[in-house]
Curated annotation (Swiss-Prot):
Protein name: DNA-directed RNA polymerase subunit alpha
Family indicated by similarity: Belongs to the RNA polymerase alpha chain family.
Record-linked CDD domains: RNAP_alpha_NTD
Catalytic activity as recorded in UniProt: RNA(n) + a ribonucleoside 5'-triphosphate = RNA(n+1) + diphosphate
GO CC annotations on file: chloroplast; DNA-directed RNA polymerase complex; mitochondrion
Source organism per UniProt: Rhodomonas salina (Cryptomonas salina)
UniProt-annotated stretches for the region Alpha N-terminal domain (alpha-NTD): 1-227
Enzyme Commission code: 2.7.7.6
Record's function text: DNA-dependent RNA polymerase catalyzes the transcription of DNA into RNA using the four ribonucleoside triphosphates as substrates.
Lineage: Eukaryota, Cryptophyceae, Pyrenomonadales, Pyrenomonadaceae, Rhodomonas
């Protein structure tokens, strides 16, 4: 199998929340470019963890359609601005942040009071404008997660007055890939994979690709040493379980049960040593009891005893 190399061929930063890199992976065998590119793209967009504000409690506000005296934005606009705040956390545990600003002032993310384990990526993100001497005061919950979480209801019933926010956990904003045919030194037709990654600044594209590759490797690793049970092994195991079933579980009549016990027949395995004719010859058993046992074995376990008499070993 061809061993490929990866190289970062381009990297740019357009502000704190817009990082871009292009990677070249080569050489790959024909068809591997699409397989690897698609797997990496889906992993980068859905499986990398990020941090976001998930709920907000604003002083004097009971629902998202409220307005706040002296604040230019309504509550819904403020929630949308908080949704865009990019954070980076050193822990997976939920935490709480706060904000209290007295106007007149333009409120940005630099005014947020964050726990020591949470890092703010862009201190210039706009939140709201306060007119006059009014005060904007809020408390917000911060969590770590994956993907994009839509709110199920506007009010978080687990915490009084908290309004939920559609959380964007994805640190990777966009991924593109392109495959190209190339020729090796031996003139063999191979592939080149070009991978473009855009992130929100909470992670470098290089680190994102590295994490994505690690996730894929760990996901596929069990397939290297996979052991499938043969049908024969499954059949033997199933037969062994059935043989261990006691005759009590067949729910026989008292007469049939006592006769079997006196004949030292305690389990299904013991019954399988008998034919239908053998059962009839058990002392005090009779045709009716034999039919009861035969019917119970067939209906409950799918077992059919042979009709003809067996020869017992001495």
């Amino acid at each position: 199998m061809t061993k490929f190399e990866i190289e970062c061929v381009e990297s740019t930063t357009d502000g704190a929340r817009d990082h871009y890199s292009k990677f070249c992976l080569e050489p790959l065998e024909q068809g591997q470019g699409v397989t690897l590119g698609n797997a990496l793209r889906r992993t980068l967009l859905s499986d990398l963890e990020g941090t976001a504000i998930v709920a907000v409690r604003i002083a004097g506000v009971s629902h998202e359609f409220s307005t706040i005296p002296g604040i230019r934005e309504d509550v819904l606009e403020i929630l949308l601005n908080l949704k865009e705040v990019v954070l980076k956390s050193q822990t997976k545990n939920p935490s709480v942040g706060r904000l209290r600003v007295q106007g007149p002032a333009i409120v940005t993310t630099s005014n947020l009071e964050l726990p020591s384990e949470v890092e703010l990526i862009d201190p210039n993100q706009y939140i709201a404008t306060i007119c006059g001497n009014n005060i904007l005061e809020m408390e917000f919950r911060i969590e770590t997660g994956k993907g994009y979480h839509l709110i199920e209801r506007s009010i978080d019933e687990t915490s009084i007055d908290f309004l939920q926010v559609d959380a964007i956990f994805m640190p990777v904003k966009k991924v593109n890939y392109l495959t190209k045919d190339i020729r090796s030194n031996d003139n063999l037709l191979q592939e080149q994979l070009l991978l473009e990654v855009w992130t929100n600044g909470s992670i470098d594209p290089q680190d994102a690709v590295s994490q994505g590759g690690k996730i894929l490797t760990e996901l596929l690793h069990p397939l290297k040493e996979i052991n499938f049970k043969s049908d024969e092994e499954d059949t033997v195991a199933e037969d062994s379980k059935i043989n261990q079933i006691l005759i009590e579980e067949l729910q026989l009549s008292v007469r049939a049960y006592n006769c079997l016990k006196r004949a030292q027949i305690h389990s299904v395995a013991d019954l399988l040593d008998y034919s239908q004719e053998d059962l009839i010859e058990i002392k005090n058993f009779g045709q009716k009891s034999a039919e009861e046992v035969i019917d119970a074995l067939q209906k409950r376990l799918g077992i059919n005893l042979p009709k003809e008499k067996t020869v017992k070993p001495n």
